[in-house]
Amino acid sequence: MQIIEITEPEQADFKQERQIAVGIDFGTTNSLIAIATNRKVKVIKSRDDKELIPTTIDFTNENFIIGNNKGLRSIKRLFGKTLKEILNTPALFSLIKDYLEANSSELKLNFANKQLRISEIAAEVFIYLKNQAEEQLKTNITKAVITVPAHFNDAARGEVMLAAKIAGFEVLRLIAEPTAAAYAYGLNKNQKGCYLVYDLGGGTFDVSILNIQEGIFQVIATNGDNMLGGDDIDVVITQYLCNKFDLPNSVDTLQLAKKAKETLTYKDSFNNDNISINKQTLEQLILPLVERTINIAKECLEQAGNPKIDGIILVGGATRTPLIKTELSKAFKVQHISKRFRQDEFKGEPAGRIKIREHRQVLQNSLVSNFMEYAVDILSDIDPDKAVVWGAALQAENLTAPHTNSLLIDVVPLSLGVELYGGIVEKIIMRNTPIPISVVKEFTTYADNQTGIQFHILQGEREMAVDCRSLARFELKGLPPMKAGNIRAEVTFAIDADGILSVSAYEKISNTSHTIEVKPNHGIDKTEIDIMLENAYKNAKIDYTTRLLQEAIIEAEALIFSIERAIAELTALLSESEISIINSLLDNIKEAAHARDRILINNSIKEFKSKIKKSMNTKLNIIINDLLKGKNINQTK
């Protein structure tokens, strides 16, 4: 889910002690924790003076070791996944295979002499960050704003929140990583337009199109590759060094490759003993990887409808590679680049908050930029490793400082709804609706003497339940037996500020109610979300036609049921010829419904209404017309 910021009216000043809250970027490769005071952000270092803490969890006996680059890696990839999904995804299975018991039936890992869930293991990273912050700040810290990928659904979000809660944090808010980066650049203040957030981390690549209008943030498209990152650049360089200089494929060679990559960000050549590599060679090696990211960014823009881009925000340490800016300049006709770091930026010595505008010649590339006929800025004056945690820290201060007059809310990434009779989806909360939100809708029964209503909660953009993702099912029981359509059940969909959905149903006559908190037992990654949206766009016409057909069939079935019941109750008012006419007309409707021909169904219903009006006696005509009024499909099984 994405973030929206709403500024509330000015309030009277009053004294209030500020609560300490931190921002946390729980990354796939590295994690950071920071605190903001008076809009100035400080990234908190570990005992060994590191700001970037490797997101690795190891153990000796029952003691956990965080950040030693050993043990379990990339645990973030596992959030919201089922054991089945992991077993069927080689890249995920490789992460846990050394910790998973053979023939295990649930997702628990043998870790520190215990059987632990993913959230329990991930909690150790949060505990480590919390301890470092408390040690540095010399105070207890219990509140945090935590960033998550824009594509994380409520299952993955819930697992992040659980891990943080186990660690002793009260999660003030989960915010989308691209929004945090934009907030770090101050784009929430009097900025309008669309920004492309290019996030190349160690293990993943994410790109988002962020629309900002008067302080309101909305992620309108996301794309990426969960298996592409700066680590892949290191691997390519390592392979080159091994082949060119006959080096072993070892950790030492990998470290040498990283050093070469970092040096070549500000020098034309790298030399070490008998090893040498120049900038041109490096760029030739990694160009295919960079081009992959550019193509993914183009696809994301197309998904968003090719809006005019006002700026590109760079996130992730791998974006320091000069070739990335060069290729972005070609693809997006960059006007100028804002830069903050000196040549020694890899040594952790930022050159202060000085923006040096470097005007660069626009390089045309018809293959990638023919749809981009305008100039944009590349924003890179904040350390790309820290941009996300900066935004989180600023949001944490915003939510706890006594002078704050802002409120952060999210938006729903995929529509939420309920299955109606006939398998049709009634969308209750639409995609990109700001939250928290509560929506009430009324539903009724379809059959006589129905004492229960089953509710099937769905997620997705398709028109039919079979094409959407099932979230949960529940039944409202104990309803009084009444004729179809007489029961009225109020159904409330409510999403809180952290994106957790609860659904409640209430029937007034029997005073019966039921509430369920929807926590899906599996998550959706960005690829699945993209596929769901793409399928919705691709099948929109077919889905609409299918829905219209199903609605016509339901209307036909409802009419047939009502008229046949009326005939049984009003036999004394009807002559044999009238009954024969009605049955003949109903047979036509039945045949049309059986043939699944929408036009034929609609024409048969029109013919029925027309002939009934002409041939029936006045009293019966009134009764039947009453039966035909007010029919709708808001009926559940």
UniProtKB/Swiss-Prot annotation:
Residues in coiled coil: none
Its biological purpose: Chaperone involved in the maturation of iron-sulfur cluster-containing proteins. Has a low intrinsic ATPase activity which is markedly stimulated by HscB.
Protein name according to UniProt: Chaperone protein HscA homolog
Family: Belongs to the heat shock protein 70 family.
GO MF term list: ATP binding; ATP-dependent protein folding chaperone
Gene name per UniProt: hscA
UniProt cross-references to InterPro entries, sorted A to Z: ATPase_NBD (IPR043129), Heat_shock_70_CS (IPR018181), HSP70_C_sf (IPR029048), HSP70_peptide-bd_sf (IPR029047), Hsp_70_fam (IPR013126), RPE3 (IPR022437)
Region (Insert): 335-376
Keywords carried by this UniProt record: ATP-binding, Nucleotide-binding, Stress response
Taxonomic source organism: Rickettsia felis (strain ATCC VR-1525 / URRWXCal2) (Rickettsia azadi)
